[in-house]
Amino acid sequence: MRAVVQRVTRARVTVEGEVVGAVDGPGLLVLLGVTHDDGPAQVELIARKVAQLRILRGERAAADVGAPVLLVSQFTLYADTRKGRRPTWNAAAPGDVAQPLVDAVADALRGHGLPVETGRFGADMAVELVNDGPTTILLDA
C-alpha cells in the first residue's frame, strides 16, 4: 500500500461537477494506492502512519488535533515507467480487491478519531488542493 500525504489548507474532489468530498481548514489529502498483496496489516499500518505523522503546524499529528482527511484512491501510484514511455499499472490491485481496502483505510482513520471524506472509487475525479508548506510525504506499508 502506498500513500501520498499532503498537508493542505483545503481540498476537494469533484465528479461530474458535483463535490463528493472536501476538507476545509488545516488537514490532510491522502492519495492511496493498493497493490496485490495488501491486506488488513497494511490497512492498519498506513492508517496509523497517516494519523500519527507529525506534519501539521506545531509538529502535531492529525490524531492530536482531529484534523480532517480527504482520502482519494489512486491506482496510478503503482505505475511502472521503467520501459518505454507508456506506464503500466500491473502492480496496482484490481478494483474488486482495492475498493474494500480503501474503504477499510477510511474506517481505520475514523477509528483514530479523524473526520474522513473520500473521493468516489473508480470515478474520473478532479482533485483540487492548496498544499500548505508545501508538505508532501510518501508512505509505503
From Swiss-Prot:
Entries under HAMAP family matching the protein: Deacylase_Dtd (MF_00518)
Where in or outside the cell? Cytoplasm
- Which reaction does this chain catalyze? glycyl-tRNA(Ala) + H2O = tRNA(Ala) + glycine + H(+); a D-aminoacyl-tRNA + H2O = a tRNA + a D-alpha-amino acid + H(+)
- Asked if the Swiss-Prot or TrEMBL record annotates the protein with the keyword Cell wall biogenesis/degradation, the reply is no
Instruction: List GO BP terms, alphabetically.
Output: D-amino acid catabolic process
Return one GO MF term. Answer: tRNA binding
**Organism classification:** Bacteria, Bacillati, Actinomycetota, Actinomycetes, Kineosporiales
Which PANTHER family does its entry note? D-AMINOACYL-TRNA DEACYLASE 1 (PTHR10472:SF5), D-TYROSYL-TRNA TYR DEACYLASE (PTHR10472)
- Keyword Amino-acid biosynthesis listed? The answer is no
- Designated name of the protein: D-aminoacyl-tRNA deacylase
Enzyme Commission code(s) on record: 3.1.1.96
Highest taxon of source:
Bacteria
